[in-house]
């Protein structure tokens, strides 16, 4: 199965709030005036971040959720994500379950997958997330103060 057929069959969904979404060499987005773009990336490696026999839909959900959590921690609204995935093989059943979990989480939080990359290799998933936050309103680690609540 080719990279383009994997993208078309499992990851090509309508994109919200983009000027150009998935399917080209790059996506185009516009950030509203008065906002900043927040960007974060997390990688999940089979055998390190999840057991090799973990259900694919759970892996997809987790890949999106850990990134959305980073946006929330900064006070940003998650909007867009790009997915890079290395697969040992293009298993249609696994890809169907993985993409179902990924998009279930994405849709719950209003995130559009706007691009990415696929290649052959040991199972590795890297998701980059982008969001918006009103200018100079980011909640940074350096802004924490004695008495602030910490959630985990």
Residue ranges: model-predicted function:
Residues 63-74, 105, 109:
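A short, N-terminal amphipathic alpha-helix
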Residues 23-25, 31-32, 46-54, 62, ...:
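Surface-exposed loop/turn and secondary-structure junction residues enriched for glycine/proline
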Residues 1-55, 74, 79, 83, ...:
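Extreme N-terminal cap/leader segments of soluble proteins
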Residues 8-11, 68, 99:
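A generic alpha-helix structural signal
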Residues 18-20, 52-66, 90-104:
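Glycine-rich anion/phosphate-binding loops
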Residues 37, 44, 77-152:
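Glycine-rich anion-binding loops of enzyme active sites
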